[in-house]
Curated annotation (Swiss-Prot):
Pfam families in UniProt: GTP_EFTU (PF00009), GTP_EFTU_D2 (PF03144), GTP_EFTU_D3 (PF03143)
Membrane-crossing residue ranges in chain numbering: none
Region G4, residue ranges: 136-139
Keywords in alphabetical order: Cytoplasm, Elongation factor, GTP-binding, Hydrolase, Magnesium, Metal-binding, Nucleotide-binding, Protein biosynthesis
Species per Swiss-Prot/TrEMBL record: Staphylococcus haemolyticus (strain JCSC1435)
Annotated region (G2), positions in chain: 60-64
Family classification: Belongs to the TRAFAC class translation factor GTPase superfamily. Classic translation factor GTPase family. EF-Tu/EF-1A subfamily.
PANTHER family with a match to the protein in the record: ELONGATION FACTOR TU, MITOCHONDRIAL, ELONGATION FACTOR TU-RELATED
GO molecular function: GTP binding; GTPase activity; translation elongation factor activity
EC number(s) given by UniProt: 3.6.5.3
Residue segments, region G1: 19-26
InterPro entries, per the entry: EF-Tu_GTP-bd (IPR041709), EF-Tu_GTPase (IPR050055), EFTu-like_2 (IPR004161), EFTU_2 (IPR033720), G_TR_CS (IPR031157), P-loop_NTPase (IPR027417), Small_GTP-bd (IPR005225), T_Tr_GTP-bd_dom (IPR000795)
Protein's UniProt name: Elongation factor Tu
The keyword Lipoprotein is assigned to this record: no
Length: 394
């Protein structure tokens, strides 16, 4: 079957659900697709379709990021259902990095929980521009005052991490009831999507900058070659253009021979699109997650840089003890983690949880970075800091 062309007439935005485990992120994702399907251009998606990665079934927690698409009158959305559980924050870091806006799901019955805070912090660190709040499971709360209290708590938490807590739209509803077809709660889903349409700014596309796409996944298509998938971070790529594969190994060049999005073929892709790029003459093992595809000469691989770093406090789930020069955590850039050695500036003996610090980092493998590149610092499966590159050294 020939693939149909992708419709570009509507503006496009990438959004996702974030929040504490079991507060209803996946149910809400299914409810949005199901309710919008009744009103027009969207294909309904069941909860099981979204929650379908094999690992998830055993533990009842969402691990992989599910991508679905739906439309409102105003926009076409690509929606990522971000994993909620702390063990899978690694995926959250790569998932949240793909968001022009987020829907923060908070169970009205439980209020904000540790991962609610962690996801707001991560959203701030990976540069998610705006969040909208969905207070879920309100059918389980009889007390109007309790709802108001939870809403106030969420707003305060957002303000604490520099989101405009007083202005953020908060919609109260029940994803499960909406999914079951309860008209009163379906209306709340439409209200939520109206808020997303209105409040989440039209993504400022970096289409005019040189092309770059962080590689998230790689697979081979028999008879066609190797495909790298990811979200175009900036610029445009047209079929037939040259790109460099940068990071981890020596830089190499290839030509993009095909571009597709949501299984539809494109002539070109631009910043914000989630695509698969078919690469000419590249073996499956020549490209890997953590590398980037970029316009030749536009970005270079480096191992040593200066950075401004915020070290999470113990209460935020960070370290309980200070660290010193020669500390060796993992540095997460875009889609991958690389071990690096920390060098603290003269006069800084140690760094306490909750501190801001300027540090020099030397990575064990080169990564495509430049001033302004953001990263997270992780150790033993948890985020302990976040930072931004301030100066490239080598």
């Amino acid at each position: 079957m020939a693939k149909e062309k992708f419709d570009r007439s509507k503006e496009h935005a990438n959004i996702g659900t974030i929040g504490h485990v079991d507060h209803g992120k996946t149910t809400l994702t299914a409810a949005i697709a199901t309710v919008l399907a009744k009103n027009g251009d969207t294909v309904a998606q069941s909860y099981d379709m979204i929650d379908n990665a094999p690992e998830e079934k055993e533990r009842g927690i969402t691990i992989n990021t599910a991508h679905i698409e739906y439309q409102t009158d105003k926009r076409h959305y690509a929606h990522v259902d971000c994993p909620g559980h702390a063990d899978y924050v690694k995926n959250m870091i790569t998932g949240a990095a793909q968001m022009d806006g987020g829907i923060l799901v908070v169970s009205a019955a439980d209020g904000p929980m540790p991962q609610t805070r962690e996801h707001i912090l991560l959203s701030r660190n990976v540069g998610v521009p705006a969040l909208v709040v969905f207070l879920n499971k309100v059918d389980m709360v009889d007390d109007e005052e309790l709802l108001e209290l939870v809403e106030m708590e969420v707003r305060d938490l957002l303000s604490e991490y520099d989101f405009p807590g007083d202005d953020v739209p908060v919609i109260a509803g029940s994803a499960l009831k909406a999914l079951e077809g309860d008209a009163q709660y379906e209306e709340k889903i439409l209200e939520l999507m109206q808020a997303v349409d209105d409040y989440i700014p039209t993504p400022e596309r970096d289409s005019d900058k040189p092309f770059m796409m962080p590689v998230e996944d790689v697979f081979s298509i028999t008879g066609r070659g190797t495909v790298a998938t990811g979200r175009v971070e900036r610029g445009q790529i047209k079929v037939g253009e040259e790109v460099e594969i940068i990071g981890i190994h020596d830089t190499s060049k290839t030509t993009v021979t095909g571009v597709e999005m949501f299984r539809k073929l494109l002539d070109y892709a631009e910043a914000g699109d989630n695509i698969g790029a078919l690469l000419r003459g590249v073996a499956r093992e020549d490209v890997q997650r953590g590398q980037v595809l970029a316009a030749p000469g536009s970005i270079t691989p480096h191992t040593k840089f200066k950075a401004d770093v915020y070290v999470l406090s113990k209460d935020e789930g960070g370290r309980h003890t200070p660290f010193f020069t020669n500390y060796r955590p993992q540095f997460y850039f875009r889609t991958t983690d690389v071990t690096g050695v920390v060098n603290l500036p003269e006069g800084t003996e140690m760094v306490m949880p909750g501190d801001n610090v300027e540090m020099t980092v030397e990575l064990i493998a080169p990564i495509a970075i430049e001033d302004g590149t953001r990263f997270s610092i992780r150790e033993g499966g948890r985020t302990v800091g976040s930072g931004v590159v301030t100066e490239i050294i080598e």
